């Protein structure tokens, strides 16, 4: 596979059909050739780092992930979060081929800003997939429902000429002869 980067970037993993890069997306996306990518899967910061607690492996642990999960020391405002999302989504659009798609995972903490940013940056959301976790962490605060799902937004460039690929028959085959639904468990 030809290297998709205008400037050399070390690859984390590579096969004949794909290249995986690990690093700061703002730096990496600016080094990529325009319209060179068929599909992007993004798992951006959820902005959960708020000095709270969660359960991991049966133990209470901090939800603070690191500085990358916070935009400022005073926390992350809605405006900061949305500006951040628009910035990286705009860079993704530049490198995505005309028929390419982007998949973005998130939780209620960030996914609504991401959906709006996608539309503002000229994307059309194809599907809103709900991933139901089989073993979510318990709700330690006991003040709301247990967070047991994540959302995956699947989108394409909002252009009348844009034609994304979807192998309907393969999905049906993988799902016991039935249409694949937008709620996944795992």
Predicted feature descriptions by range:
Residues 1-186:
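Core catalytic lobe of class I
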């Amino acid at each position: 596979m030809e290297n998709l980067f205008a400037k050399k970037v070390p690859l984390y993993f590579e096969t004949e059909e794909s290249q995986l890069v690990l690093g700061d997306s703002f730096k990496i996306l600016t080094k990529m050739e325009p319209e060179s990518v068929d599909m992007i899967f993004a798992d951006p910061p959820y902005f959960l780092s708020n000095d709270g607690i969660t359960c991991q492996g049966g133990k209470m642990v901090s939800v603070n992930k690191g500085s990358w999960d916070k935009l400022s020391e005073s926390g992350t405002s809605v405006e900061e979060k949305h500006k951040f999302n628009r910035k990286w989504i705009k860079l993704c659009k530049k490198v995505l081929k005309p028929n390419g798609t982007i998949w973005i995972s998130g939780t209620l903490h960030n996914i609504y800003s991401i959906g709006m940013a996608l539309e503002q940056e000229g994307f059309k959301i194809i599907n809103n997939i709900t991933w139901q976790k089989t073993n979510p962490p318990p709700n330690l605060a006991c003040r709301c429902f247990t967070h047991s799902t994540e959302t995956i937004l699947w989108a394409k460039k909002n252009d009348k000429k844009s034609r994304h690929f979807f192998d309907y028959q393969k999905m049906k085959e993988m799902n016991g002869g039935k249409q694949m639904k937008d709620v996944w468990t795992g």
